[in-house]
Structures are given as structure tokens and as C-alpha cells.
Amino acid sequence: MSLAHGDTRDSLSNRRDFLEGLGIDYRDLVCARQAHLSHVQYISASDKGRGALSEEDAFCNTDALITDNRRLPLAVFTADCLPVFLYDPKNQGIGLVHAGWKGTKEKILTKTVLLMQELFSTRTKDLLVGFGPSIRQCCYAVGREFFDFFSYGLTSRDGQLYLDLVGINKKEALDLGVDKTNIFDSSVCTYCNPKEFFSFRREGPSCGRMMSVIMLK
């Protein structure tokens, strides 16, 4: 699905075929040139189509998108990192977050929710949060330096340290005041499922990317 990673020859047709069944025009997508940072971008109606057909006009150095505009599909691309879907049904605002370990360290989920609160008057008790497929604690081996980055979500097994990327973001959502019954997790590990998902850890930098999309109807 990516225009920058993996075999991109069929990326546009893949996007079209995937989104057609959802009633979404792939040419309307708003995408970001993700940088594993924590910048959150508000998307206005005039931004429709940015990054849809070319990587060049996507939002640069951006890893989270929010909007309150209808028929404006937001997209992020992952291959082990965690896609986080946010929906405020009361005020009709949405957000989509690309949360790798670096963005998680910088609390990108919190920054996204705070901007939704500022712009949409979102109340965290109303917020619905969804975690898509990502590398899970079963497979996410990391170095001892991660103890300097996270005080939670690290476990040791057979002499190796493992990171719970989803668990850290879930705790962050709960700490913000999101109701635990409003948190939904796919429980899918990208590393464990080579036939269904790309995995940067498994395949290396040349692997393709999955696309996550959210839109207000």
C-alpha cells in the first residue's frame, strides 16, 4: 500500500481495490511522510488527496492525523508499528496514529488526544480507541537501553528483553481517562503472521507496508 517502501508498482491499484468496497475514493486519501516522531496534524477539507497519489505532497514529518471533516479519509502505513484508531462519537472527530517505539516514547497518543480535546472538545470518557495489528510482546525483542525509555511494558524472558508496545499505549489511554470498555484490540502480531502481514523486524527495510484508514461517513 505504500508509495515509498517495498514493491510499489501496484500500490495505487491496491489502494483503489481495497477502498472501493468501503465506498472510499483512493484519490481522496490524506497521508503522511511518517518519521517516527510525535507531530500531530489537523486535516482540513482543503487537504483532501494529499499523499494519495504521490509521496511528495504528503504531510512531512507527521505521525498522527486528526479531522472533524466528513468524507475525508486518513491513512497511516505500518509494518510492525502500532496503528491507533480514535473516534469521538459525541463531537464527531477522528484520529489515526502511527505509534512506533519512538513515537510511543514521545507520547504521541497523548498528544493526539490533547489536540482532539482542544479542537473538538473531545472528552476522553467518550473516546473509542482501537489498536490494529502490530508486533507484540511475544516477538518484540529490544535492548537493555529501553529501560531508559520506558518504566512500564518491559519483560525479560530467557535472558532477552521484550517490549509491550500495545500495553504501553493502552495504559496511556487509560491514564488519560479512556474507559477500558471503549478500548478495542485486534490482538494480532504482525511478526507471528508472515502470510498475512508485513513485518519490518522479520523482512528488513525493503518490506512493504499495510495501510490503516479511518473516515467520518
Give the role of each language-model region.
Residues 1-217:
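Active-site microenvironment for binding and transforming phosphate-containing groups
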